[in-house]
Amino acid sequence: MGAITLDGKATRDEIFVDLKQRVAALTAAGRTPGLGTILVGDDPGSQAYVRGKHADCAKVGITSIRRDLPADISTAALNDTIDELNANPECTGYIVQLPLPKQLDENAALERVDPDKDADGLHPTNLGRLVLNNPAPLPCTPRGIVHLLRRYDAEIAGAHVVVIGRGVTVGRPLGLLLTRRSENATVTLCHTGTRDLPALTRQADIIVAAVGVPHLLTADMVRPGAAVLDVGVSRVDGKLAGDVHPDVWEVAGHVSPNPGGVGPLTRAFLLTNVVELAERE
């Protein structure tokens, strides 16, 4: 018997129905939310991501605010654009699309964003608020992972969760989310220095693979019935590949497909962050 699919697309559509109603209420009150994007250069992947985000905005009624800049832009010109969106009353929240060209300092750009307009939830101030369990925009992918587990009734409270990957967008903030009292999981954060990864994953109730190593997690590393979320993205022979080997579906109880699992929820919670920022105003 195969695993239950953690369907990110269907779950995203449910979230969009709720967001559309909330945006309509905000618009009726004269506070239409606006999502801004700053895109530097012509990287095809980044362009596709930004197009997708603005298409999502149109579905729920959020105003789109795009700032597309040339690849050879100076730091001063990028800073001017960030400052403009910080001051723009129509822009409720926004993102600086990464990666940036090599002449630009990504960390400096992200720190210049107003923390109260941080749609990604990755500003250092907001990550600090997450540590303190204070209200703040939450990182979108970790929030999507938690929501997807809850949507399919995967038990989180008391569960042992093994997270493979310690990146700032997924691994580290996910550990903080899952150990809040509202989730109450026990988290093991694994990385390249982990000595015996299979021994740890075999103990896990939930495994989140987020390293970008194709088919890293195989069936022999998974306890029967465990929930497995595939967040990593890489390419093999020109095709997208996740971190989870297809044979895991025969062992696990729940698996998120890749694509179509966590990815749609990352975008859904980007919009959710913007709507919540508008509701707080």
Curated annotation (Swiss-Prot):
<keyword id="KW-0368">Histidine biosynthesis</keyword>
<dbReference type="GO" id="GO:0005829">
    <property type="term" value="C:cytosol"/>
</dbReference>
<dbReference type="InterPro" id="IPR046346">
    <property type="entry name" value="Aminoacid_DH-like_N_sf"/>
</dbReference>
<dbReference type="InterPro" id="IPR036291">
    <property type="entry name" value="NAD(P)-bd_dom_sf"/>
</dbReference>
<dbReference type="Pfam" id="PF02882">
    <property type="entry name" value="THF_DHG_CYH_C"/>
</dbReference>
<dbReference type="GO" id="GO:0006164">
    <property type="term" value="P:purine nucleotide biosynthetic process"/>
</dbReference>
<comment type="subunit">
    <text>Homodimer.</text>
</comment>
<comment type="function">
    <text>Catalyzes the oxidation of 5,10-methylenetetrahydrofolate to 5,10-methenyltetrahydrofolate and then the hydrolysis of 5,10-methenyltetrahydrofolate to 10-formyltetrahydrofolate.</text>
</comment>
<keyword id="KW-0521">NADP</keyword>
<comment type="pathway">
    <text>One-carbon metabolism; tetrahydrofolate interconversion.</text>
</comment>
<keyword id="KW-0028">Amino-acid biosynthesis</keyword>
<feature type="binding site">
    <location>
        <position position="233"/>
    </location>
    <ligand>
        <name>NADP(+)</name>
    </ligand>
</feature>
<dbReference type="GO" id="GO:0009086">
    <property type="term" value="P:methionine biosynthetic process"/>
</dbReference>
<keyword id="KW-0560">Oxidoreductase</keyword>
<dbReference type="GO" id="GO:0004477">
    <property type="term" value="F:methenyltetrahydrofolate cyclohydrolase activity"/>
</dbReference>
<keyword id="KW-0486">Methionine biosynthesis</keyword>
<keyword id="KW-0658">Purine biosynthesis</keyword>
<comment type="similarity">
    <text>Belongs to the tetrahydrofolate dehydrogenase/cyclohydrolase family.</text>
</comment>
<dbReference type="Pfam" id="PF00763">
    <property type="entry name" value="THF_DHG_CYH"/>
</dbReference>
<dbReference type="InterPro" id="IPR000672">
    <property type="entry name" value="THF_DH/CycHdrlase"/>
</dbReference>
<dbReference type="GO" id="GO:0035999">
    <property type="term" value="P:tetrahydrofolate interconversion"/>
</dbReference>
<dbReference type="InterPro" id="IPR020631">
    <property type="entry name" value="THF_DH/CycHdrlase_NAD-bd_dom"/>
</dbReference>
<keyword id="KW-0554">One-carbon metabolism</keyword>
<dbReference type="InterPro" id="IPR020630">
    <property type="entry name" value="THF_DH/CycHdrlase_cat_dom"/>
</dbReference>
<dbReference type="GO" id="GO:0004488">
    <property type="term" value="F:methylenetetrahydrofolate dehydrogenase (NADP+) activity"/>
</dbReference>
<feature type="binding site">
    <location>
        <position position="192"/>
    </location>
    <ligand>
        <name>NADP(+)</name>
    </ligand>
</feature>
<dbReference type="GO" id="GO:0000105">
    <property type="term" value="P:L-histidine biosynthetic process"/>
</dbReference>
<keyword id="KW-0378">Hydrolase</keyword>
<protein>
    <recommendedName>
        <fullName>Bifunctional protein FolD</fullName>
        <ecNumber>1.5.1.5</ecNumber>
        <ecNumber>3.5.4.9</ecNumber>
    </recommendedName>
</protein>
<feature type="binding site">
    <location>
        <begin position="165"/>
        <end position="167"/>
    </location>
    <ligand>
        <name>NADP(+)</name>
    </ligand>
</feature>
<keyword id="KW-0511">Multifunctional enzyme</keyword>
